[in-house]
Amino acid sequence: MHKDFAIIRELELAIQKKPDSLDSISHLSIPKLTDLTYIPLLYRWCREIADLDRISKKEFKRRFMFIVFFLYSPSVLAGDKRTINGIRCVLAEILDYHAPSAISNSIPSIIADYKNYADFRVAVGDMYTRVLERLEGQGIIVGI
């Protein structure tokens, strides 16, 4: 057998694992929120939570976008290019960007910051925890 044909066996194994992978992706991609009208409320809460005197406007926006994408479209933070319809427009308007494409262009660096910088992870985690408490307290989401 030609050594290049070994790829066939690798493909067979990958195809066998695919259904489990798809189930896992489907389950992990379920958003905690779907109603985009909550984004302005999330923005207000995040502004209240963040110490805006200690972080730049840019840093705040990045933390806020991470939290919004995690709540509405978590697969985006894992590299999926598809977001839920309308989220970029809402974020662009709230964050005063000229076009929704600016939101899309920010995603790779937000992902990189989360992966590479512990202080970013901690700050986002703290903000997310406090936002989640408010969401649960308001009955917007039920304990996750």
Predicted regions and their residues:
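Short, basic interhelical loop/turn and adjoining N-cap
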Residues: 89-106
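Short, charged recognition helix plus adjacent turn
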Residues: 138-144
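Short Cys/His-based metal-binding microdomains
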Residues: 111
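Short, amphipathic alpha-helical "recognition" segments used to contact nucleic acids or chromatin
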Residues: 59-86
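Generic structural marker for isolated residues within well-ordered, non-membrane alpha-helices
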Residues: 43, 88-89
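Short, Lys/Arg-enriched N-terminal segment that forms or immediately precedes the first helix
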Residues: 42-55
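Short Lys/Arg-enriched helix C-cap and helix-to-coil transition segments
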Residues: 114-136
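General nucleic-acid-binding
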Residues: 1-45
